A protein has these predicted regions:
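Glycan-association/targeting regions that enable binding to alpha-glucans and other polysaccharides
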Residues: 1-112
């Protein structure tokens, strides 16, 4: 006998486009509600590539006054091979949100 239960997990991150392309613009949105950076006044996107083998950049995020969500837009470096790896931090309080030490990843668009 199985019980039917539905669970709604909070979605902290959205990547646009879903498969970012090298040399093109990418926007990462972060919803801090319910997470460790919920009370942060400043959030930075910590961005690397391919398992964080290399740190690409730290990108200051802007907070949308209406939704309260954070947003950062950047150009995907041509040197990115397989995926972007990223997490978020509050530089003023030294607090990180790294998805339980798993970070987040976005697959880079394939070039055919």
């Amino acid at each position: 006998v199985f019980d039917r239960a539905e669970y709604a997990a909070h979605r902290f991150v959205r990547v646009e486009p879903a498969f970012p392309a090298r040399g093109e613009s990418c926007t990462i949105r972060y919803d801090a509600q319910g997470g460790p950076l919920e009370a942060s006044g400043r959030v930075v996107l910590h961005l690397g590539r391919d398992e964080f083998n290399d740190l690409l950049m730290d990108v200051p995020m802007e907070r949308d006054a209406e939704s309260g969500r954070w947003r950062a837009t950047f150009v995907v470096p041509d040197s990115t091979k397989w995926h972007l790896a990223f997490c978020f931090f509050d530089p003023e309080r030294g607090i990180w949100h790294n998805n339980h030490a798993q970070n987040w990843q976005a697959l880079v668009a394939r070039e055919w």
